[in-house]
């Protein structure tokens, strides 16, 4: 087995197990179950199970921030009002969350766990620095952009997990409501645009 391939498969399997069973039941045995990978490969590729879980979260987090950075230029599209631009960005990220149930649930379970604070919080903040820098030109100078981004992510993840768990249906009016909750909460922090009708 190629080392890189095994490492990637272990990360993928860890994501699947976290999503299916939660972190408490994500044992090394469960991670390799149903594969031809021996448990020992976990310790030859990672220092311990905790590092494997952290790298699995890194993989998910990198994919999410990559998606955000891909669509973030929408916020600077000329000819559209700020709310329309914000809705387009929101829709892009929401569609990604809805289209990746397993990854979304695994992300949420790790993000709100003690593992995140202990192993991943610092790297997570560094990973989002480019997004914070881009958003800084949209928000007023006194706004805490990192806090605002965390709030937006928290709200989107909270509603996304409700949809994925079947507690709420993904309907157009429901999605619009989520957007409005977020937009109305943060619009007070936007920098005033010249020649804009935004209030």
Features from the language model and the residues they span:
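Generic hydrophobic, amphipathic alpha-helix propensity
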Residues: 6-15, 31, 56-60, 64-68
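Helix-turn-helix
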Residues: 9, 17-51, 55
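An amphipathic alpha-helix signature
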Residues: 11, 87, 91, 128-136, ...
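Hydrophobic alpha-helical connector segments
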Residues: 55, 70-99
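Hydrophobic recognition helices of helix-based DNA-binding modules
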Residues: 56, 60, 64, 68, ...
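Amphipathic alpha-helical packing segments from all-alpha helical-bundle domains
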Residues: 65-69, 114-150
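Amphipathic alpha-helical segments used for helix-helix packing
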Residues: 92-118, 161, 165
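Hydrophobic/aromatic-rich alpha-helical bundle segments in the mid-to-C-terminal region
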Residues: 105-109, 136-182, 189, 193-199
